[in-house]
Amino acid sequence: MTVNEIAQDLVALCKTGDFETPGQKYWADDVVSVEAGGPPGMDPVSRGKAAAAAKGEWWAGAHTINSTSVDGPWVNGDQFTVRFHMDVTVKESGQRQVMDEIALYTIKNGKIAEERFFYGA
């Protein structure tokens, strides 16, 4: 698949609320996933499919998604970006927050080799 095809499919899946399948389908075995700030007690850098999946499972378990929108993708060479806008409730505190995030994906050999997440300041 081309970078554009991967990008389009990832966005289409996320727009349905499916944030798990894109990783299963497109992460390289040695994917590197970098958060702007790591989850509490966790490293902001996850290395490998299992670590990236564990981070996603933690996030899904810690938040309730009230609404989400996904924009993009925007493709440039072997990379693309996607904008995620989410209204979530933190399960532990009950606090509601709006998150605006840009994800930058780098593709190598038809797989996501790296993903970086950027948050609004």
What residue ranges belong to the model's regions?
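Short acidic-aromatic low-complexity motifs
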Residues: M1-D30
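A solvent-exposed, acidic/Ser-Thr-rich amphipathic alpha-helical stretch
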Residues: E20, Q24-P73, G77
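Short loop/turn motifs at secondary-structure junctions and domain boundaries
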Residues: T64, Q95-Q97
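Hydrophobic/aromatic beta-strand elements that line small-molecule binding cavities or substrate pockets
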Residues: S67-W74, M86, D100-T106
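Short beta-strand edge/turn micro-motifs at domain boundaries
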Residues: D100-A121
